[in-house]
Design a protein with these regions (language model features):
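Beta-strand/beta-sandwich contexts
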Residues: 516-548, 578-579, 589-602
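Short edge beta-strand/loop segments characteristic of extracellular beta-sandwich folds
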Residues: 456-458, 537-543, 607-611, 622-624
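Short proline/glycine-enriched turn/loop motifs at strand-loop junctions of beta-rich domains
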Residues: 462, 543-548, 615-619, 664
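Aromatic-rich carbohydrate-binding modules that target alpha-glucans
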Residues: 614-666, 674-694
Length: 704
């Protein structure tokens, strides 16, 4: 894998000029509300890029071909930023704007299909001519990020690093680097691509990471050139002002490599790394792998289990206990479930009004989304009631052209009220969530941030519902018959709360009651980055820290570089690593705890290979060791690296696993075999190995 080192210089040299661009500063992303923009279908800001010379004929001015370009671009997004800001959204997630293929991909019926969605890349170093200019420069992207930052908004870019384009037609998966052709899938002399069959078992981690999907050229992130090229592409967009990077198809991309990528971005500047990992629910066979992936790498996942639960619960005959089950389980499993990206629809599923026709119920679902834990995402047009019922609103009919920017629309005004509440109330933006009561059509939950509390009472019943308010009153700290008005002022038929008296909730209603305490109680809202490198700066966000206090990590006192009531900054320790408990003790003796992952050094990808080892049915192989990725000495499967995969691409079928390891560090590790009952056996003698300074690399081990 080190044969490509001469080519790596080409990528690195093209990156030197980028250092002058300013990058995002540390930010509490928990407080963000994201507006998802499907760029081609949002707003046409410049007509001269509709039918550019290098890719003519892919644009449909009539907008009858749903798989053609329709004219939306980065200039259009920039023009509508004030509209998005007024809605109450503090960040935008834009669909991929990287250079996509120039040739059409005709469908089975011979109809022209264009990469209007942005997910069929050819050059990750350039901006597509349909979204920027014919020079494929960053001018329009720079203008967008500057305008967003001037409005105190953030920009998250979508990067489909798993693949290029279809390998069986059009450009045959071609990969370019700043305009220079590198390879395509059919002529892959440098092994930039995987060449395995399509995934047939979506519960097999090896197939998921190394197999192909949708006939797309599957990039090999363990190839040294590809590794460097993709990391530099992400860094290039970061240098041009991107505040976050969405990893498309995260479940299908090398899991260890994504941790290396996130680490490289975190080491440059604070950044939100978002991973798209499709799950049907918390009972999905890949759910535990998703949790481990997020926890160990500090990557925020899209909350598909919650989205699917909400879509089922609010549909006719639904059950709100599905929502409660997901929230409760994820709160237990994720280091910080407030890092999850929450939504009710997006570009890969039918819009919410396609499955719920009742406008009031849709508004109740939006209110539930915007008052629940996580970082909420509003899909473009939701505020205007935008949807198309053709073929049930499935792809591509979930991506209609934005029709209106009416700021007096009912959904727009409701979202404005909800976002204003969320942005001004720490309990709603960052508070821990706890269920007070839940049934098939009633859901009452608490959000608590120190002494600040919000209680949300949702009823989907078609008639009035009685609710014992005793626990609600206790949660809010009400005294006697103290009254709390509905924070939405009845916008969703909400009512006031009077002490612990029994409530009669109106049909199809949502009430929000708040307690904003004057008491100073330490509360940790977020830690950025969530996976830090030893010696690098870490920021703790929250409330009630006072002007001084004590900070400890894994019981060891730390020196801080700054301390304010809402923010503490320190450097991650050099000698402690792994998943560690962080505690803040304010001067008034109030305490708050959270967790932080610390890695030893910048990370490089190492593939460990174990040949000639036979395991019994039901047994799995793990790697334990003294680094964060290997469990930092823990022998628990959730902490160690693994289970190792069986390399189906080899006749010998050795065990293998790509692991993010600290560059240049000496590491002690052991192999261990587990089954459903626990530890079966482990090596008696450790392997003492020096990790490479550069990756990706391969280390072969034998059992000892």
């Amino acid at each position: 894998m080190k044969k490509q080192s001469s080519r790596v210089a080409l990528v690195v040299s093209s990156f030197i000029a980028l250092q002058s661009f300013s990058m995002a500063q540390a930010a509490d992303f928990h407080r963000d509300i994201i507006y998802q923009v499907f760029t081609d279908r949002f707003f046409n800001g410049r007509k001269d890029n509709d039918n550019p010379p290098q890719s003519p004929g892919l644009f449909d001015a009539s907008r009858k071909n749903w798989k053609a370009y329709w004219g939306g671009d980065l200039a259009g997004v920039k023009e509508k930023l004030p509209y998005i800001k007024s809605l109450g959204c503090s960040a935008i997630w834009i669909s991929p704007c990287i250079d996509n293929i120039n040739k059409p991909e005709n469908d089975a019926a011979g109809n022209m299909v264009a990469p209007y969605h942005g997910y069929h890349a050819r050059d990750f170093m350039r901006v597509d001519e349909h979204f920027g200019d014919s020079d494929m420069s960053f001018k329009d992207f720079d203008a967008l990020t500057k305008a967003a930052h001037d409005l105190d908004m953030r920009v998250f870019v979508d990067m489909p690093f798993n693949h290029t384009s279809p390998y069986n037609h059009a450009e045959y998966g071609a990969l370019y680097d700043a305009g220079q052709f590198r390879s395509d899938v059919e002529n892959d002399r440098n092994k930039y691509f995987h060449h395995l069959p399509a995934v047939s078992d979506f519960n097999d981690p090896y197939q998921l990471q190394y197999g192909t999907i949708f006939y797309l050229g599957d990039l090999d992130q363990e190839n040294q050139y590809v590794d460097t090229y993709l990391k530099q592409a992400a860094a290039k967009f970061q240098s041009h002002g991107a505040d976050g990077t969405r990893l498309d198809a995260a479940k299908h991309m090398n899991w260890g490599w994504q941790h290396v990528l996130a680490n490289s971005l975190y080491n440059r500047a604070d950044h939100l790394v978002l991973g798209e990992w499709w799950l049907t629910g918390i009972d999905d066979p890949m759910y535990k792998d998703a949790v481990k992936f997020a926890n160990k790498g500090g990557i925020s996942l899209y909350d598909f289990p919650l989205a699917n639960a909400i879509r089922k619960a609010f549909a006719e005959g639904g059950d709100l206990t599905l929502v409660d089950q997901v929230v409760s389980q994820e709160n237990k499993d994720f280091i910080d479930s407030n890092e999850l990206l929450t939504f009710i629809d997006n570009h890969d599923m039918s819009r919410f009004p396609n499955i719920v026709k009742d406008k009031k119920v849709t508004q109740l679902a939006l209110a539930t989304l915007l008052t629940s834990r996580g970082i909420p995402i509003i899909y473009y047009g939701t505020e205007q009631g935008l949807y198309d019922d053709t073929k049930g609103g499935e792809d591509p009919y979930d991506r209609p052209m934005m029709q209106s920017f009416d700021q007096s629309a009912d959904n727009y005004k409701l979202i404005q009220k909800l976002t204003a509440l969320r942005q001004t109330n720490l309990a709603l933006s960052s508070g821990k969530q706890r269920t007070l009561f839940c049934s098939k059509d009633l859901y009452v939950f608490e959000r608590r941030a120190g002494a600040d509390v919000a209680v949300v009472a949702l009823s989907l019943k078609p008639k009035e519902a009685l609710l014992d308010a005793a626990e609600v009153a206790t949660s809010l700290g009400l005294v006697d018959n103290e009254v709390r008005q509905d924070a939405l002022a009845g916008a969703l038929s909400g009512i006031a709360l009077e002490g612990a008296k029994q409530l009669s909730l109106p049909p199809q209603s949502l009430s929000i009651w708040l307690t904003n305490s004057n008491k100073s109680s330490a509360f940790i809202a977020a830690i950025r980055p969530p996976a830090a490198t030893a010696g690098k700066a870490v920021t703790v966000y929250g409330k009630g820290f006072g002007t001084s206090g004590k900070l400890s990590l894994a019981g060891e006192a730390l020196t801080t570089s700054s301390w304010a009531d809402d923010k503490i900054v320190f450097n991650a320790p050099l000698l402690k690593h792994g998943r560690l408990v962080l505690e803040v003790e304010a001067a008034n003796s109030s305490k708050a705890k959270s967790e932080l992952v610390v890695v030893e050094n910048k990370l490089v990808l190492v593939r460990f290979v174990v040949p000639d080892l036979k395991l019994a049915a039901g047994e799995q192989l793990y790697i334990s060791g003294n680094t964060s990725a290997l469990g930092a000495g823990s022998l628990l499967p959730n902490d160690m690296a693994g289970p190792m995969l069986v390399n189906q691409d080899s006749d010998e079928k050795p065990y293998m696993l790509a692991v993010p390891m600290p560059a240049g560090e000496s590491v002690e590790l052991k192999l261990a075999v587990y089954n459903a009952k626990g530890l079966v056996r482990a090596e008696t003698k450790p392997h003492n190995l020096k990790m490479p300074q550069l990756g990706p690399s391969v280390i072969t081990m034998t059992w000892q």
